[in-house]
């Protein structure tokens, strides 16, 4: 709803759910230190094996480490695998144009996220997460938004997100305008 605000007390009880370590700062720097809990979904990236250890060290030293919980799921390697010229929303987030393993892993991770995120959303009144078009067009951001929104719809949890978009994600963003 346009014009609604969230109080400082409500923000302190809110949950921030992001796909990757650093998304909490890149997309939510203005509220990250004010929310009660930060949930990071993915940790390992099969395309960059050393990244998980570096991310673990960084999360341990993060200034907000006391409120960060990392689910530790492995990334899907789906970035750039949706058809962004004609993006097709799906129950997992987006239809992945690539066939085979990437599409299967994307579906599997969405199912895992539904299970892992359900308790966080069931206990929350307000959740901040990625927008429906994945900011600049990141398939895993779209997935996280879809899972969070679907879980929130079954209760009274309010979902908040930014309006950032890029030329890559504008087509999908325009599908949500006027809702």
Regions found by a protein language model. Name each.
Residues 1-123, 153-154:
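Active-site rim/loop-helix segments in enzyme catalytic domains that contact anionic ligands
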Residues 73, 129-134, 138-139, 163-164:
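Short, well-ordered beta-to-alpha junction loops that form the rim of enzyme active sites
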Residues 22, 127, 140:
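Divalent metal-coordination and catalytic microenvironments
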Residues 141, 151-158:
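Acidic/His-rich, metal-assisted hydrolase cores and their charged scaffolds
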Residues 158-166:
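His/Asp/Glu-enriched short active-site or ligand-binding loop at hydrolase and phosphoryl-transfer sites
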């Amino acid at each position: 709803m346009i014009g609604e605000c969230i109080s400082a007390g409500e923000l302190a009880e809110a949950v921030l759910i992001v796909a990757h370590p650093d998304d909490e700062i890149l997309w939510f720097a203005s509220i990250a230190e004010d929310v009660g809990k930060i949930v990071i979904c993915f940790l390992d990236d099969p395309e960059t094996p050393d990244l998980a250890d570096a991310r673990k060290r960084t999360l341990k030293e993060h200034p907000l480490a006391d409120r960060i919980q990392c689910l530790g799921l492995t990334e899907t390697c789906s970035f750039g695998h949706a058809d962004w010229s004609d993006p097709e929303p799906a129950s997992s987030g987006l239809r992945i144009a690539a066939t085979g393993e990437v599409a299967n892993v994307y579906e599997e991770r969405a199912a895992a996220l539904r299970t892992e995120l359900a308790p966080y959303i069931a206990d929350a009144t307000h959740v901040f997460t990625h927008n429906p078009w994945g900011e600049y067009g990141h398939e895993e951001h779209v997935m996280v938004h879809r899972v969070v929104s679907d879980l929130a719809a079954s209760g009274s949890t309010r979902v908040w997100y930014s309006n950032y978009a890029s030329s890559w994600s504008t087509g999908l963003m325009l599908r949500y305008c006027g809702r």
